[in-house]
Amino acid sequence: MKIIVFGITHKKATIDLREKVAFSQSKKQEAYSLLKESPFIHEAVILSTCNRSEVFAVVQDTSIARRWFKRFYTDFFQLKETALEGCNHFEKGREAVQYLYHVCVGVDSLVIGEDQILGQVKEAHAEALDFAATGKILNKLFLEAVTTAKEVKTETAISENALSISSIAVKQMENHLKGLVGKTVLVVGFGKMSRIAIENLLCKGIKRLYICNRTKESVQELIEKHPQIHYLSYDQKYEMLNGVDAVISATGAPHFIFYKEDMEKIYQKHRPMCMIDIALPRDIDPAVKEIEGIELFHIDDLKEIANENLAYRMDCIEIIKQSINEAIEKYEGWYQCLPIYPRIQAIKAYSETLTDQELEKLFKRLDHMAEEDRQVIEVVVKSLVKKMWKTPILQLKDAGIRGNGEAFAAFVDEFLGLDAGCGK
């Protein structure tokens, strides 16, 4: 079995392509069904964010898996045959393991060191568990990668000066409007990215903040705490455009929610407006930027601000990589021993059965012996047997880590006179 990862990220793929291959919730359900049906895929976890669309998997044959996943993406998302050329990535074995650790720490993010990706990885793993698509190999990998990421983030403070996509959007807005004090802002959506944006906006001295969401109940607590916050129903989003200085949109809609044709009918040019779209798929029709008076930004336009404080965070990366390599060595040791564990359990079961049988024979011959004395003998014999097996079992584990566990197991069988198939 081999661990692989296939997909696309912000490093090679444009936002147009990332938008096409984003796994919505409904698409995830369908995708997991297909992944579970495939004879080539034994375990799978889908990681889909605004900057990446990837599948981590356990496969038997990496060459077949690479071709299979390329075809899967092309067919599932109805892409042209050449759509993924030059912009997909594929890692296998240690490289795939290392890649996930880097993703969790934020080394592979648009914003180096950002924290949001760690939560997204945890959610992706939880979803895979819900769909019964993952197993012991990826479960162990994701849990270890998340744990290591938390530790190294604390040790190195790589996230200390990092920004999230949402906070970068607010900073872009602040730069474009030359300050946010006294401004009026509309935030569309109330998911995690929207809430982070709202937290940042409330620190900027804005005059009024409108939150547009399908239900008022979810934002009621914020409204009660902050008098400058007002609720808008989803149907009112266009009506407010002429009364705000800026818009941040971050919904989970699978289609545009702001269209050029509709905005042209409503938007009045008496005041310029900044619109920032941090959703994927995008919320705002890219053609909106053609409307006079409107400045439109999407995720890929935020890279310059994302690189602020980058030098400090890059200094942390070498320390992080060392910690990650140590964690990977530990995981790979566990992974290499997977074929050995059944043999170890079989050896233990064999020795326990043999010990119990011999003790039973002994106690039948010594039926006059007091129960207390029997217990003493049983404890001593079982302890002795356990000690005798300790070194062979440790050697078997070490052999597994070195990659020659099966050969060593066969030697142990022959040397100790066990059945050749006791570990199968």
UniProtKB/Swiss-Prot annotation:
Any one of the GO BP annotations: protoporphyrinogen IX biosynthetic process from glutamate
Catalytic activity: (S)-4-amino-5-oxopentanoate + tRNA(Glu) + NADP(+) = L-glutamyl-tRNA(Glu) + NADPH + H(+)
A family per Pfam: GlutR_N
Gene3D superfamilies named among the record's database cross-references: Glutamyl-tRNA reductase, N-terminal domain (3.30.460.30), NAD(P)-binding Rossmann-like Domain (3.40.50.720)
Binding site for substrate: 49-52, 109, 114-116, 120
Active site: 50 (nucleophile)
Superkingdom classification of source: Bacteria
UniProt-recorded name of the protein: Glutamyl-tRNA reductase
